[in-house]
From Swiss-Prot:
Main localization (coarse): secreted
Similarity remark: Belongs to the venom protein 11 family. 01 (wap-1) subfamily.
Designated name of the protein: U15-lycotoxin-Ls1d
UniProt-listed GO biological process terms: defense response to bacterium
Entry's localization field: Secreted
Organism: Lycosa singoriensis (Wolf spider)
Length: 86
């Protein structure tokens, strides 16, 4: 009986996570000098602890998702490299 209750609670918790929309946070920076552009990540797998790889004017950084839209996830791709981009 206890295992059935636990299974139902676990299913409800997973369902609420899947149904809630998550976004990269909106960047407060609108522009960045080219010499300061740096990528800490290129894809979500480069980030730890449930954070996402999000694009900003100053590069890609690992950020925790938020429920407010406005940010942009990093596109990644073969041309993306970590470190300074200049």
């Amino acid at each position: 009986m206890n295992s059935k209750i636990f299974a139902v609670l676990l299913l409800l918790a997973l369902l609420s996570c899947v149904l809630s929309d998550q976004y990269c946070p909106k960047s407060s920076i609108t522009a960045c000098k080219k010499m300061n552009i740096r990528n800490d990540c290129c894809k979500d797998d480069d980030c730890t602890g449930g954070s996402w790889c999000c694009a900003t004017p100053c590069g890609n950084f690992c950020k925790y998702p938020t429920d407010r839209p406005g940010g942009k996830r990093a596109a990644g791709g073969k041309s993306c490299k970590t470190g300074y981009v200049y």
